[in-house]
Amino acid sequence: MPYTEKITWQGRSLTLTRDEPPTKVVEARSDEVRLETLDITDAAVRPSNLDAAEGTPLPVFQAPGVRVDVSKRKTAPMGFWHRNMEHDELIFCNKGGMIWETELGTVTLRAGQMLLIPQGVAHRAVPPEGGGENILIELKMAPMARRVFP
């Protein structure tokens, strides 16, 4: 049975057909390259915004032009408005919900939904009535993100 591998870079692609899957390797060694997992539900992943109005999300991964933060705000609205002048912010609600007040309007996110806040737009997060556990992934990325599906 042939295996197909599609390689993509800078808008180009190359399709390879192999006799064996690319996961069938004799050995893979590196001190720098590895798969990493992070359980964002772990209590040890504790951003300062969990129970503090002035708290902020916890940065967990970073590369040039992108940063991934975990937010678990549950008791108090942000005590300040934030205007990110460097990045667009893509907010993914993994668990619970969050109200986002922005100068472009107010959006309520529920688990499974995402919100793109463009660079330079003032915003703040407000937990919904009743609080509860909220887990959000915030992706800070180079500005001018555009939606490509539907």
Predicted regions, residues:
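Short, conserved beta-strand element in jelly-roll/cupin
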Residues: R83-W100
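Short strand-coil-strand connectors
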Residues: P64, E101-G105
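A short, N-terminal "cap"/entry segment at the start of jelly-roll beta-barrel domains
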Residues: M1-R67, S71, F80
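Short acidic-glycine-tyrosine-enriched beta hairpin
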Residues: L104-Q119
